[in-house]
Amino acid sequence: MRVEGIQRNWKQWWIWGILGFWMVMIYNVRGNLWVTVYYGVPVWKEAKTTLFCASDAKAYDAEVHNVWATHACVPTDPNPQEMVLENVTENFNMWENDMVEQMHQDIISLWDQSLKPCVKLTPLCVTLHCSNRTIDYNNRTDNMGGEIKNCSFNMTTEVRDKREKVHALFYRLDIVPLKNESSNTSGDYRLINCNTSAITQACPKVSFDPIPIHYCAPAGYAILKCNNKTFNGTGPCNNVSTIQCTHGTKPVVSTQLLLNGSLAEEEIIIRSKNLTDNVKTIIVHLNESVEINCTRPNNNTRKSIRIGPGQAFYATGEIIGDIRQAHCNISRTAWNKTLQEVGKKLAEHFPNKAIKFAKHSGGDLEITTHSFNCRGEFFYCNTSSLFNSTYTPNSTENITGTENSIITIPCRIKQIINMWQGVGRAMYAPPIEGILTCRSNITGLLLTRDGGTGMHDTEIFRPEGGDMRDNWRSELYKYKVVEIKPLGIAPTKAKRRVVEREKRAVGIGAVFLGFLGAAGSTMGAASITLTVQVRQLLSGIVQQQSNLLRAIEAQQHMLQLTVWGIKQLQTRVLAIERYLRDQQLLGIWGCSGKLICTTAVPWNSSWSNRSQEDIWNNMTWMQWDREISNYTNTIYRLLEDSQNQQEKNEQDLLALDKWQNLWTWFGITNWLWYIKIFIKIVGGLIGLRIIFAVLSIVNRVRQGYSPLSFQTLTPNPRGPDRLGGIEEEGGEQDRDRSIRLVSGFLALAWDDLRSLCLFSYHRLRDLILIAARAVELLGRSSLRGIQRGWEILKYLGGLVQYWSLELKKSAISLFDTIAIAVAEGTDRIIEVIQGIWRAICNIPRRIRQGFEAALQ
């Protein structure tokens, strides 16, 4: 009894030991994490890249921005898409935005391009004999106070050795006296730029009215947009969307006042890099526009003056009517209300202090006045009357004036413009004929704050300007460019099967706007959108190439490829290079054409000790990328080393005879091949059986078919030399044997005719009977054939059913046999192991019995 109990206990311990061993193995297998590569994850990083532009410019427009946009920009998308990124917070900084620098360089190149084919006015650096413009006719007034000078000078004609005296009108701001004389007197003058910079005359048919320009990111990059209505330009933004192109930005060149821009959606926004630093410019974004109407009332005429062969200088010829000063009109009520709101917002940043607005403290004319372009004429308007008020917090007084009154600010006009792009460059703007009127909207202010410690209870703000980057920054403050990083790495429990020959799927490739649509989702939720994101990346590249080809085709008639065309090519090449670089990495890692690629690289807990559930259920791809960014290069190197080792192992394995490794016989690939060969053999046997059955049926049909015999004997008529029947013959004699003996020509002819008719009748009757018999036999044969065909089909159906049952029985028998063999083999193995174990367990007892026997 004790022996049986010991055996039973050992058997239980053996079973529990096996179960525990397999549980430990399963736990170890499940506990390991492996590096998995994902292609198309919503991850990005801040980047600087070449942007291209889109515009609605027309090729036939002569306006300078349109000319530039036609040559450089692709058509705008009629249905722009914007994808909101849920649960995403992104940092923006309008003061360190590369988009602003790019737009600045683009506008500089725009102006340079517009002046490149125009006339250089170096020959105009001559002595000008000028006097104040006088009134030649009655009933005309001149309130300009010597603002316009009537100058005469000698100029070279078409023939270089001949000169002639010409007259032209110049603004006083464009000329300086040669001697220390008052500019109000008559005397000798020169153009203001002759001792400082070269001057180029703007082409006469070109104006400077801007059109909206959209900046677009190339494929592989995206533009993030902050949609917070009170965003001040810096810091985090929790309402982010991704777009392909910005809104249309008008490149308006102006100082002090921002014109024709976008408006704040809710309240006035104050933006500055550092409000406590009085050197930094303050950009005020208005929520309501203030209309400003500017007019040059003088009805000017323009005349052309020859300054050399093939060169013409355009100057003001005459002023028709009164000579009046240019000016701008602003509604006093609207302006005072706006300034009141601006003062209120500034007081929030400077509490317990009065906010005072004052005129500019001094400097160049371009920054001390509100300078802008009006239909080709450059205005410089004095804004002292606009910025001359004080806002006191908690005061009942408002900055208001007479209701419905108008603020009129005087303006001066210059034709020689110091280019804002750089020092030492100037441009001559030809006079525009007729009366000029411009209507614009003030959408922002450029201010600066006085420093020092003079007034502790008052902050003085003055209009500022001059750096056109602030103009572009006021429109591009809510955008930033990011680079898409479609390659993601994360730990999973799936491991790559190694040292196997596999057919890799052909790659499908990789805008664009839906690409980052899952950015705020968890990693597990975002991974299901990889296919869509990868396809949109490739479609973005293709779409950009298509747009580029259309843009080049539009300018093909002029055979021009300016710097803008080069930028387009750069963006195209950049997008393709990024795509190829990602595909190269996937190829090096053995992941070509795969969106999710398992690897044989184990995950190191030093990279991240988070659990798999925590990573995939609680983190976004952006958060995960930031966490492992320091180890990305290390993981990339390990992936490359693993793939190299994998390829080396495959090469070594393929070098051996595959039949030497019997284990490969039981691989799933070989079993599929065995099944395919078996199906082919069975199909061949069934086909042979069908062929022999058909041949047998045909043979039987042929044996049972007896056609009408054409050898049936018919009674032949006896000849005239044949004897009659014997005497014993009885019965009626045949008609052939009746021979009529006729004589005479008519009788013979009649007999022959009768014989011919009878012969024809009998032959025709026989032919009809044969045809009827043939038709009858053919019908019977056809019916018999249809019946036999139906029998053949039934036979084939039965044959197929029989063989299917046989195959089913064979398969069931095969599986039963395998199951029985496996069960019996398992039982035998268990019995052998139990026997060995019992033998081992009985060794002490046998030794004891041996000692007992020896001692006895």
From Swiss-Prot:
Glycans are attached at residues 87, 132, 139, 150, 154, 180, 184, 195, 228, 232, 239, 260, 274, 287, 293, 299, 329, 336, 382, 388, 394, 398, 441, 604, 609, 618, 630. Residues 505-525 are annotated as: Fusion peptide. The chain crosses the membrane at residues 678-698. Residues 626-660 form a coiled coil. It holds the Pfam family GP120. Residues 567-585 are annotated as: Immunosuppression. Disulfide bonds join 53-73, 118-203, 125-194, 130-151, 216-245, 226-237, 294-328, 374-438, 381-411, 591-597. Keywords: AIDS, Apoptosis, Clathrin-mediated endocytosis of virus by host, Cleavage on pair of basic residues, Coiled coil, Disulfide bond, Fusion of virus membrane with host endosomal membrane, Fusion of virus membrane with host membrane, Glycoprotein, Host cell membrane, Host endosome, Host membrane, Host-virus interaction, Lipoprotein, Membrane, Palmitate, Signal, Transmembrane, Transmembrane helix, Viral attachment to host cell, Viral envelope protein, Viral immunoevasion, Viral penetration into host cytoplasm, Virion, Virus endocytosis by host, Virus entry into host cell. Residues 381-411 are annotated as: V4. Residues 151-194 are annotated as: V2. Residues 1-31 form the signal peptide. Residues 655-676 are annotated as: MPER. SUPFAM superfamilies: gp120 core (SSF56502), Virus ectodomain (SSF58069). Residues 32-677 are extracellular. Residues 130-150 are annotated as: V1. Residues 712-732 are annotated as: Disordered. One of its GO terms (biological process) is adhesion of symbiont to host cell surface via host glycoprotein. Residues 454-464, 456-464 are annotated as: V5. Some of the most genetically diverse regions of the viral genome are present in Env. They are called variable regions 1 through 5 (V1 through V5). Coreceptor usage of gp120 is determined mainly by the primary structure of the third variable region (V3) in the outer domain of gp120. The sequence of V3 determines which coreceptor, CCR5 and/or CXCR4 (corresponding to R5/macrophage, X4/T cell and R5X4/T cell and macrophage tropism), is used to trigger the fusion potential of the Env complex, and hence which cells the virus can infect. Binding to CCR5 involves a region adjacent in addition to V3. The membrane proximal external region (MPER) present in gp41 is a tryptophan-rich region recognized by the antibodies 2F5, Z13, and 4E10. MPER seems to play a role in fusion. Inhibitors targeting HIV-1 viral envelope proteins are used as antiretroviral drugs. Attachment of virions to the cell surface via non-specific interactions and CD4 binding can be blocked by inhibitors that include cyanovirin-N, cyclotriazadisulfonamide analogs, PRO 2000, TNX 355 and PRO 542. In addition, BMS 806 can block CD4-induced conformational changes. Env interactions with the coreceptor molecules can be targeted by CCR5 antagonists including SCH-D, maraviroc (UK 427857) and aplaviroc (GW 873140), and the CXCR4 antagonist AMD 070. HIV-1 lineages are divided in three main groups, M (for Major), O (for Outlier), and N (for New, or Non-M, Non-O). The vast majority of strains found worldwide belong to the group M. Group O seems to be endemic to and largely confined to Cameroon and neighboring countries in West Central Africa, where these viruses represent a small minority of HIV-1 strains. The group N is represented by a limited number of isolates from Cameroonian persons. The group M is further subdivided in 9 clades or subtypes (A to D, F to H, J and K). This is Envelope glycoprotein gp160.
